[in-house]
């Protein structure tokens, strides 16, 4: 997942590649001599230049690496557009992030459902009762959904109430009861908001970048999601 290498080696057949993707070594390329006879090996017209790794168009911004198979695609900045780029730069502004862990899920459904889920502001206050009970995301939050000019990407922005406290009972704003009326935390300070200069207001920004990337900033935590379809034609 990370590290520093001077070359890339396929563990299966030990083909080695330079960091620019060019093939630089093939074991037994000339075959193996046995009993005066050469067995195996690559054909005489084998040219390493024709067997390099697939080259990608790469862009790096704020320490985040993006890659595309389409070398004619517009720049990353133009692809995001100024509206979404503003929230991306707010999140990835060069400060050091600490990776706390990884989570992988296999979902039997259309890959677009994950993108739609992040854009939907109605379900958090109805489905996620923990959010409702402790005022993390409720219908009375100040929220808005912003999109790029081509409606490919979106940022759902939400700000908790005054001083980060929810007012009124959960059922007052959700029209549903919390999962457990007496639910409480042993240490309420777990939910305290510790403002950081880069926030500039929102306590949660959920970004979707079409077609397969999601960035979620919720209070002081950040999570990224990468959708990887595995169906026919993926």
Model-derived regions: residue spans:
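C-terminal catalytic domain of Rieske-type non-heme iron oxygenases
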Residues: 56-234
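Rieske [2Fe-2S] iron-sulfur-binding domain
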Residues: 1-71, 78, 82-85
């Amino acid at each position: 997942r990370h590290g520093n290498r001077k070359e890339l080696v396929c563990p299966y057949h030990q083909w080695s590649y330079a960091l620019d993707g060019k093939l630089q070594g093939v074991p037994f390329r000339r075959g193996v001599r046995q009993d005066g006879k050469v067995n195996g090996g690559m054909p005489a017209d084998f040219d390493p230049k024709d067997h390099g790794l697939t080259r990608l168009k790469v862009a790096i911004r704020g320490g985040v690496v993006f890659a595309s198979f389409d070398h004619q695609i517009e720049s990353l900045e133009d692809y995001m557009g100024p509206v979404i780029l503003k929230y991306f730069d707010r999140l990835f502004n060069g400060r050091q992030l600490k990776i706390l862990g990884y989570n992988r899920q296999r979902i039997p459904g259309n890959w677009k459902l994950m993108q739609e889920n992040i854009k939907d502001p109605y379900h958090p206050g109805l489905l996620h009762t923990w959010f409702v009970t402790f005022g993390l995301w409720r219908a009375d939050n100040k929220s808005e959904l912003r999109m790029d000019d081509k409606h490919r990407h979106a940022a759902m922005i939400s700000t908790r109430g005054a001083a980060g406290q929810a007012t009124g009972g959960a059922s007052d704003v959700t029209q549903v009861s919390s999962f457990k009326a007496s639910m409480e935390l042993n240490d309420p300070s777990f939910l305290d908001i510790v403002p950081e200069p880069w926030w500039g207001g929102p306590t949660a920004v959920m970004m979707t970048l079409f077609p397969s990337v999601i960035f979620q900033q919720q209070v002081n935590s950040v999570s990224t999601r990468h959708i990887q379809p595995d169906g026919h034609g993926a």
